[in-house]
A protein has these predicted regions:
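Cytochrome P450 heme-thiolate monooxygenase catalytic core
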Residues: 165-332, 351
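Charged/polar low-complexity intrinsically disordered regions
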Residues: 98-101, 107-210
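Cytochrome P450 heme-binding "Cys pocket" and the immediately downstream C-terminal segment
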Residues: 467, 478, 484-522
Length: 540
């Protein structure tokens, strides 16, 4: 056969293939996709753990039915309760479907201490979060989660500086609330709560992160909020797809996030260069009291390879913005709805005002100190009760299996690459642990502390930042969320500023009832499109 004739074989074969729009063509494409998915599941995906039951599937099942996966997506809360009461509370592990093709291995709470004691080369938290967040696609590298030193600084440096930044935060809250809630003392204003709180939290958190004036730059703040939305979409969509397809969506989201990072760098890079120069050449000058400065000082000591890598430092700011803004905005929305919704029964707003007037002064001229804010036991209770019921995620204490021979405490082998976790929402609403567990009782935890004090007993460990196997909003153990102390401080300051300076209520059409949260798969979301009414209180 000649070379010319052999080159004609390709077009001839293509001509013989069925058209893609024909029934045979559609069937062929479907068959190819099914074969690809089968190969992905058998070769690329982490196998199902042997011997661990699959919820709502017959004994011995090795994959989830489409029905069970649909139930996870559309009605996950009952599935979580079933997993908790029928398996986990009985000391048994169980597998749940996850988003897309994922599977989730849940261990019982009685194995948590043992699980957390395993070294990182056996069970790794950073690698687990890197996979859950799909950060290698969104930010181009998993180091921003696996080696998240920008977050550890919050724990070890920023928390010590809270006293210094407290009144700066008070000034920032005045600035942003005057703009978002208004200053009218005569007329009620209807607030679209979600976008309003998003901007409030973005500005307040940015005062901690990058300081003035950048924290008031609306383009910068919107950039942070838009990037956070891309992170959530990438984690859900890319993480839920078969591994063979992830490069397509992951690359797309990497490009979208990259464009946001490029925009952010026009603000961050000049600021970084200025701060690095000051730290190196003018150490005698007063230092800005914000996270960016602490990051630079840490990087000069411990990460010299990154300190003048402007792209890497910018991406760490992006990662920190997500941690500082996203969950806090959700919890502040829940907090305000819960305070207003419980006011008729518990007189919540007046009780909080009394405590804050006593600790902060009845006018707005005094300084806000760390000790005063930490003494707000009733505000602490109101906030802890809100996150008990409003945690965004239904699971915590994530770990990724890093070895080939791992077995759980009770002997179940889990394949390398398995993601395991512990259920949180059903444990945090268990009636055996919390009386009327699904009810929002604002002073549930402060009552427990006050009753213990009246008996001369030690206060129970029920503060906002306290974690336990039955209270996992911030995780548990040495890897618990390092930023929870800052979130605690921030939420108390926001709550104090609102109740001291504004009257708040629901619109009349709500008839005094708090709109319910809604679940998307296992994500517990505040109600969308919710409004509140606000009016500035006249100064005494």
């Amino acid at each position: 056969m000649s070379a010319a004739s052999s080159m004609d074989v390709g077009p001839e074969l293509l001509a013989r293939l069925p058209a893609l729009t024909s029934p045979l063509g559609i069937a062929s494409v479907a068959a190819i996709l099914l074969i690809a998915l089968f190969i992905t599941e058998k070769i690329l995906s982490v196998p199902y753990p042997p011997g661990v039951p699959l919820i709502r599937e017959p004994e011995g099942s090795r994959r989830f039915s489409l029905r069970t996966r649909w139930q996870y997506l559309t009605n996950c809360q009952p599935m979580f309760y079933e997993a908790y009461h029928q398996y986990l509370k009985q000391g048994k592990a169980v597998v749940l479907p996850g988003f897309g093709v994922r599977i989730e291995v849940l261990l019982p709470q009685n194995q948590m201490k043992w699980t957390m004691s395993q070294p990182d080369h056996v069970l790794d938290q950073g690698k687990a979060f890197a996979e859950i967040d799909q950060v290698s696609w969104s930010l181009g590298h998993d180091k921003y989660v696996v080696d998240a030193w920008q977050g550890l600084i919050v724990k070890y440096e920023m928390n010590r500086a809270i006293e210094v930044v407290a009144n700066s935060m008070k000034d920032e809250l005045r600035e942003v609330f005057d703009e978002q809630f208004g200053t009218d003392t005569e007329n009620w204003k209807k607030i679209d709560l979600t976008p309003t709180v998003k901007m409030i939290i973005a500005q307040a958190a940015s005062r901690f992160t990058v300081g003035v004036p950048l924290c008031r730059n609306k383009e910068y703040l919107q950039n942070a909020l838009d990037t956070n939305e891309l992170f959530i979409l990438n984690a859900g969509l890319t993480g839920g797809l078969p591994r063979i397809i992830q490069p397509f969506t992951g690359t797309l989201f990497g490009w979208l996030v990259g464009s946001k990072v490029s925009q952010l760098k026009k603000w961050i890079v000049p600021l970084l260069k200025q701060r690095v120069d000051m730290a190196k050449n003018h150490p005698e000058e007063p230092e800005p009291q914000d996270l960016l400065q602490m990051m630079i000082k840490y990087a000069l000591r411990e990460r010299q390879d990154e300190v003048e890598n402007w792209d890497s430092m910018a991406r760490r700011i992006v990662a920190q913005n997500f941690g500082a803004i996203h969950n806090t905005q959700l919890q502040v929305i829940n907090l305000l709805l819960n305070v207003i919704g419980s006011d008729a029964e518990f007189n919540t707003i007046s009780v909080l005002r009394d405590e804050m007037d006593r600790l902060l002064g009845s006018d707005d001229t005094g300084n806000w100190t760390k000790s005063a804010i930490q003494s707000m036991t009733r505000a602490d209770s109101v906030s802890r009760e809100s996150i008990r019921l409003g945690s965004f995620g239904g699971r915590a204490v994530f770990r990724k299996v890093m070895t080939d021979d791992f077995k759980t405490q009770d002997g179940h082998p889990l394949p390398k690459g398995t993601l395991l976790s512990f259920i949180s929402f059903p444990a945090q609403t268990d009636d055996e642990l919390y009386e009327d567990g699904l009810k929002y009782d604002p002073f549930r935890f402060s009552r427990a502390r006050e009753e213990a004090a009246s008996r001369g007993d030690k206060a129970p460990p029920v503060t906002f930042v306290t974690t336990s196997p039955e209270f996992l909003t911030f995780g548990h153990g040495k890897h618990a969320c390092p930023g929870r102390f800052l979130i605690d401080f921030e939420m108390k300051m926001i709550l104090a500023y609102i109740v001291k300076n504004y009257d708040i209520k629901f619109p009349d059409e709500y008839e005094g009832k708090r709109p319910s949260n809604y679940w998307i798969a296992e994500a517990n979301n505040p109600p969308s499109g919710v409004h509140i009414m606000v009016k500035r209180r006249a100064q005494k």
